[in-house]
């Protein structure tokens, strides 16, 4: 589903190969019509793939009999070496573009042309020219994340503890944004709120930061819902029943007992939602304006201009942030083995170096706003 709905990759390196998201975007921008028809076709195909996958998953289930567990067999050194070579080879090929991206960000540039030597000038230009985009990449997804956590916690509780036809419908509808391409969702938001809700003039939010916040919240809600549902399913209802039998209200039980116990699932889903919010382009490219553009939009526009140094610097910053948040998510869910002291200290140093420009940028932005006032 992620590959089907991806916009940035085929748009930048797809050349003559157009995918559904790219086709929908070009049709919408050119105003020749047809984008709605292509959007409906994309939704039908995505929904069909999702239903087929769900049918196969429900039909075929596998379990292991504890009475006859699988016995491990010794593998020859040649097979072990082949497995390691294959796995690490795939990882190296996957990471190689990122390594070259970091290398490109430190190349010395003269205008838009790379020259001999190395320099951090691309990063200076990125912070000077794209400071607002970097600030928006934190500010807008952070507000959206608060909404995602609130709605995901509430919906997951209804889906697990209050199961009925209505809550099942809400749970199913909350997964729709996951299968819908981002360009389709962006066009839907523009069509719905360009002249207000149903053309009434109420909620004319197209071109504002609020429509970006809404789109990011709706688009990334399924990640946190599924993580929260999985966490809540591991909590016995008898714990809540015991609290209520001792005089605690349902709201108090939910706030002080249930929510803290499912906090690890909420945090894991929230960080995953955050990483996808700051790194996705498909919805933002349709809904942004000059004041609300994010780093992904800035990277896209810099690549189109041929300014690869600044684009590489912004991409490197975004990559480091994504790795940090993803690692924190794995640590919070207990999926990551504790690192040695030296590696842990190095990790703290990497976080400090990567986040320090962001905090200085926030102070700079606040100072500029105070001066304007």
Name each region found by the language model.
Residues 36-77, 157-159, 229-240, 244, ...:
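C-terminal transmembrane helix and the adjacent membrane-cytosol boundary/short C-terminal tail
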Residues 1-5, 85-98, 176, 180, ...:
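Transmembrane alpha-helices
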Residues 75-86, 154-189:
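Cytoplasmic-entry segments and transmembrane alpha-helices of multi-pass inner-membrane transporters
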Residues 10-15, 68-73, 107, 111-120, ...:
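Membrane-interfacial helix termini and adjacent extracytoplasmic/periplasmic loops
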């Amino acid at each position: 589903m992620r590959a089907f709905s991806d916009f940035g990759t085929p748009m930048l390196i797809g050349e003559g190969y157009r995918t559904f998201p790219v086709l929908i975007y070009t049709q919408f921008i050119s105003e020749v019509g047809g984008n709605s028809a292509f959007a409906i076709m994309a939704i039908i195909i995505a929904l069909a793939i999702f239903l087929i996958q769900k049918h196969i998953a429900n039909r075929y289930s596998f379990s292991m009999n504890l009475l006859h567990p699988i016995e491990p067999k010794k593998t020859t050194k040649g097979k072990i070496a082949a497995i390691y070579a294959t796995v690490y080879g795939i990882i190296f090929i996957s990471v190689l573009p990122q390594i070259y991206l970091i290398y490109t960000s430190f190349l010395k540039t003269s205008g838009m042309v790379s020259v001999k030597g190395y320099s951090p000038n691309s990063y200076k230009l990125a912070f000077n020219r794209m400071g607002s985009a970097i600030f928006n990449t934190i500010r807008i997804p952070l507000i959206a994340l608060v909404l995602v956590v609130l709605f995901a916690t509430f919906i997951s509780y209804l889906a697990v503890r209050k199961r009925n036809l209505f809550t099942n419908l809400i749970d199913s509808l909350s997964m729709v944004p996951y299968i819908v391409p981002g360009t389709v969702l962006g066009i839907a938001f523009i069509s719905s709120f360009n002249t207000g809700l149903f053309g009434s003039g109420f909620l004319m939010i197209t071109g504002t930061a609020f429509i970006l916040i809404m789109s990011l919240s709706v688009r990334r809600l399924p990640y946190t819902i599924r993580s929260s549902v999985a966490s809540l399913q591991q909590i016995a209802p008898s714990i809540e029943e015991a609290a209520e039998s001792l005089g605690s209200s349902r709201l108090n039980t939910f706030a002080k007992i249930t929510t803290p116990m499912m906090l690890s699932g909420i945090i894991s889903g929230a960080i995953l939602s955050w990483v996808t919010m700051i790194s996705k382009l498909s919805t933002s490219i349709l809904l942004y304006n000059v004041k609300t553009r994010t780093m992904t939009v800035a990277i896209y526009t810099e690549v189109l201009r041929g300014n690869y140094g600044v684009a590489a610097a912004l991409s490197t910053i975004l990559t480091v942030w994504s790795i940090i948040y993803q690692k924190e998510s794995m640590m919070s869910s207990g999926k990551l083995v504790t690192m040695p002291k030296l590696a842990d200290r190095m990790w703290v140093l990497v976080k400090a170096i990567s986040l320090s420009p962001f905090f200085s940028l926030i102070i700079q932005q606040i100072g500029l706003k105070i001066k304007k006032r």
